[in-house]
């Protein structure tokens, strides 16, 4: 398939050199580069794992973390969050 793409003169010159070195056409070199780029993007797109903490590092009992009012009350009382467990 034919298409027109605008690329920098520097990249085009490098691609032509690579094509000569490998004995390939310019189109084959560009296609290989795009395939590698797309493959790398797919591999790197894996979702990161989220650590799960057990044993004392989570929210304290008696404090509703979804309520701004509850958090403000705890902070306004001057009590440390650890004292509410």
UniProtKB/Swiss-Prot annotation:
UniProt KW Lipid biosynthesis keyword: no
GO BP: positive regulation of growth; regulation of DNA-templated transcription
InterPro entries in alphabetical order: CopG
Taxonomy, superkingdom: Bacteria
The entry's keywords: Toxin-antitoxin system
Induction: Induced in persister cells in response to D-cycloserine.
Purpose: Antitoxin component of a type II toxin-antitoxin (TA) system. Upon expression in M.smegmatis neutralizes the effect of cognate toxin VapC31.
Protein name in the entry: Antitoxin VapB31
Species, as recorded: Mycobacterium tuberculosis (strain ATCC 25618 / H37Rv)
């Amino acid at each position: 398939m034919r298409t027109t793409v605008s690329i920098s003169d520097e990249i085009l010159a490098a691609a032509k050199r690579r094509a000569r070195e490998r004995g390939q056409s310019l189109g084959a070199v560009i296609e290989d580069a795009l395939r590698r780029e797309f493959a790398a993007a797919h591999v790197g797109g894996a979702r990161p794992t989220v650590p799960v903490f057990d044993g004392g590092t989570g929210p304290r009992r008696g404090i509703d973390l979804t309520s701004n009012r509850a958090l403000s009350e705890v902070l306004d009382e001057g009590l440390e969050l650890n004292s509410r467990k």
